[in-house]
Amino acid sequence: MIWEEILNFEPYRAVEGNYRIWLDKNESPYDLPPQLKEEILEELKRIEFNRYPHITSDPLREALAEFYGLKKENIAVGNGSDELINYLVKMFKGKYIVVTSPTFGMYSFFAKLHGIPVKDIPLKEDFTIDGERIAEEGKAASAIFIASPNNPTGNSQPENEVLKVLDSGRVVILDEAYSEFSGKSFIPKISEYENLVILRTFSKAFGLAGIRCGYMIANEKIIDALYRILPPYNLNSLTMTVAIKMLEHYDIVKRRIKLIVKERERIRREFIEYSYPSEANFLLMKLDAYDYLLKKGIVVRKLSGRLEGHIRVTIGKKWENDELIKALKEFLEECRCG
């Protein structure tokens, strides 16, 4: 009854259980302030729940357009960036998509789901892309996916290397899910490159992982094409209301970004020999401490393949980071003594 390919598909899994500290999903450690939640609840009371939301999510698209100084025709929104990636892998002409491992796994996930070949052009030793190689080997690509800052390594990609790929003329999907933490973005290049698509999310810096809201910025032709195949009413009224309210309170987001960056650098200083530079809300660490931390009630992300023996640690609240630092120091001490 069910296609064999689906039964053999490796699903996305996340650790569940009653653990003390969760530092595995790159979420913000901060919930919304109670006063802001009350403000949102007042807005939600005005929604007619018996009515469908706007068919193309225009209220949020217009709010984002104003936020970035763009037109709503340059913006599409979805149920997390994942929904948008699901369509982007199959929208453009070409023989395969390009990914640059180690990187976010959902690009390959959705491509394989739709039977689209994936060409992996690995990151260099320092986790940066080789723009010339990608441009050359990606000549027949339908889309080239680049994450900057990259997940799970945390580094931003050099602008000149990204430009080499853009100059190839192939469609470049630049995933900027963590760009608020780096302060770097290619959004100003949208008007210059018709082949540039930028992915963004409300899940990380905005602290809204629970509402599942992502968006993309691109030229009007690409956005128009996407809305021809997106399901109508794809984003619900509650999600749009919360996202719009957070754009109005971006001062809260900026303060929290500063706190997270400060904590990130504090942890990095403690483990400078074992951690890589990061411009995201997490650290890549060359420590095979996943099982040890789990026994201490701390969940981090265990990595594999090229990053076997590494962990990815989301930056938490100060007390959570204190517990992490303490546990990792104990781990290192046991390694030395053992």
Curated annotation (Swiss-Prot):
Keyword Transferase recorded: yes
Keywords: Amino-acid biosynthesis, Aminotransferase, Histidine biosynthesis, Pyridoxal phosphate, Transferase
Catalytic activity: L-histidinol phosphate + 2-oxoglutarate = 3-(imidazol-4-yl)-2-oxopropyl phosphate + L-glutamate
UniProt pathway annotation: Amino-acid biosynthesis; L-histidine biosynthesis; L-histidine from 5-phospho-alpha-D-ribose 1-diphosphate: step 7/9
Top-level class of the enzyme under EC nomenclature: transferase
Entry's EC annotation: 2.6.1.9
InterPro entries hit by this protein: Aminotrans_II_pyridoxalP_BS (IPR001917), Aminotransferase_I/II_large (IPR004839), HisP_aminotrans (IPR005861), PyrdxlP-dep_Trfase (IPR015424), PyrdxlP-dep_Trfase_major (IPR015421), PyrdxlP-dep_Trfase_small (IPR015422)
Residues annotated with N6-(pyridoxal phosphate)lysine modification: 204
Disulfide bonds listed in the record: none
Extent of the signal sequence: none
The family this protein is said to belong to: Belongs to the class-II pyridoxal-phosphate-dependent aminotransferase family. Histidinol-phosphate aminotransferase subfamily.
NCBIfam families (alphabetical): hisC
Name used for this protein in its record: Histidinol-phosphate aminotransferase
Native source organism of the sequence: Pyrococcus furiosus (strain ATCC 43587 / DSM 3638 / JCM 8422 / Vc1)
Protein's gene: hisC
